[in-house]
Amino acid sequence: MESLNKFKLLMAEIGEVLKATSVVQFENGYWVIEYGESELVWIYYHVEDDSFTLSAEAGNIQEQDQLELFKFFLHFNALGQEQRTVKTALSGKGDSCMLLGDHSATSLSTLDFSGIFFSFAEQLIHWRYLLKSWPTATSEDKQKMQENISFMNPHLVRA
């Protein structure tokens, strides 16, 4: 529980560092950070391995695009599997895409957390653009969007 208490202290300080609208703890291990214009990032702290997960809704996937995007998600997730970097996941509804980032909390400082958070928020912007633009994009445009995300530096989101 000592590691959870350290993480709670970090979360108590992080709002000011991030210039967040609010940081709210809902129960042991669960927080939400609100920033910008009602942007929400959820945080879950894993006591068993002293790590945390960031999650945010990236957008919706139209039914006709699901197969094509699912293949891309599998490829993207496989690249980040060993590095514990941002990966995509789909909600139970089948059309809502969540962006997740798993990170170690061991020896985590507020500066480390803010870097992880801002990198996550940056990738969220890219994913939202991809999902919004996908239905009307040409094959060439889709390829460029995939390359832009595939070439993101995975070390930017490592703890």
Regions found by a protein language model. Name each.
Residues 132-159:
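Short, highly charged C-terminal tails/helix-capping segments
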Residues 1-42:
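Charge-rich, low-complexity N-terminal segments
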Residues 85, 90-118, 122-139:
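Well-ordered alpha/beta subsegment
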Residues 27, 46-48, 93:
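Structural motif
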Residues 58-96, 100:
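Short, internal acidic amphipathic alpha-helical interface segments
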Residues 10, 14, 66-75, 117-120:
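Short, Φ-rich (hydrophobic/aromatic) sequence segments
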Residues 42-45, 50-62:
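A short acidic-to-branched-hydrophobic micro-motif
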Residues 31, 50-52, 95-97:
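Hydrophobic residues embedded in beta-strands of well-ordered beta-sheets
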